[in-house]
């Protein structure tokens, strides 16, 4: 199975996804290689979503020699990808290789590191910009963020998505690495969300970072440390 259920989340099991994740986890991986790795990982995840979450239909096709039956993926015109700025940008770039006709939304949301994590394991979230396309009942909405840590940011983003007038056919949360705490928080905030991650790591540290994780994905992708 390309995507396996693990409790409240699902894991992308493709060998190339695990290979790319291992490469970008490495502290020695430099900025360009890290960013390109996130792009490749997004592309692999996109193909696995197509294989594991989208339906196909048979259709007649005329070849140069005869008529035969072929198979097409349904719903490729009805995909919305939401980029959670900024870390998701290279991840989304890869997803767009798999979904070139997807409509795109952008939400600039980040946690307040100075305020710190409260006793419930949550961060206050600052949302500075939201631009979403119209969402229809036929859509598959993919919210992409490489790191699902405390789940505070994703729960806030989901509030914006679900406040739209129309409920999409499928609502997917896609991450490269997730913490158990974040999965629980997102599942409680939006039970209908289908959480998909390449890896589910051990825990969060006292600062709310995923362990073993891969560091700050945004800083590593954009070399802002």
From Swiss-Prot:
Domain of life: Archaea
Required cofactor names: Mg(2+)
InterPro entries: PRibTrfase_dom (IPR000836), PRTase-like (IPR029057), Upp_A (IPR034331), UPRTase/APRTase (IPR050054), Ura_phspho_trans (IPR005765)
Keyword Glycosyltransferase: yes
GO BP term, pick one: uracil salvage
Disulfide linkage: none
Pfam families: UPRTase
Residues that coordinate or bind uracil: 210, 215-217
Keywords of this entry: Allosteric enzyme, Glycosyltransferase, GTP-binding, Magnesium, Nucleotide-binding, Transferase
EC number: 2.4.2.9
Free-text activity regulation comment from the record: Allosterically activated by GTP.
Chain sites annotated for binding 5-phospho-alpha-D-ribose 1-diphosphate: 86, 111, 145-153, 216
Residues annotated to bind GTP: 36-40
PANTHER family, alphabetized: ADENINE PHOSPHORIBOSYLTRANSFERASE, URACIL PHOSPHORIBOSYLTRANSFERASE, CHLOROPLASTIC
Family: Belongs to the UPRTase family.
Record protein name field: Uracil phosphoribosyltransferase
Organism: Haloarcula marismortui (strain ATCC 43049 / DSM 3752 / JCM 8966 / VKM B-1809) (Halobacterium marismortui)
């Amino acid at each position: 199975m390309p995507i396996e259920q693990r409790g409240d989340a699902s894991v992308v099991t493709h060998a190339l996804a695990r290979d790319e994740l291992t490469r970008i986890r490495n502290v020695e991986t430099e900025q360009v290689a890290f960013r390109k790795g996130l792009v490749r990982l997004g592309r692999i995840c996109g193909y696995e979503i197509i294989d594991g979450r989208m339906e196909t239909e048979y259709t007649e096709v005329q070849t140069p020699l005869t008529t035969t039956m072929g198979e097409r993926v349904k719903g490729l015109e009805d995909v919305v990808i939401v980029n959670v700025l900024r870390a998701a940008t290279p991840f989304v770039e890869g997803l767009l290789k798999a979904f070139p006709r997807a409509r795109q939304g952008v939400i600039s949301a980040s946690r307040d590191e100075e305020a710190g994590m409260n006793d419930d394991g949550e961060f206050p979230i600052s949302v500075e910009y939201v631009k979403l396309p119209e969402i229809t009942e036929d859509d598959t909405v993919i919210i992409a963020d490489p790191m699902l840590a405390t789940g505070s940011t994703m729960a806030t983003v989901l509030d914006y998505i679900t406040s739209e007038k129309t409920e999409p056919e499928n609502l997917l949360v896609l991450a490269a690495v997730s913490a158990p705490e974040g999965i629980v928080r997102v599942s409680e905030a939006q039970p209908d969300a289908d959480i998909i991650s390449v890896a589910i790591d051990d825990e969060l540290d006292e600062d709310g970072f995923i362990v073993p994780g891969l560091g700050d994905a945004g800083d590593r992708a954009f070399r802002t440390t």
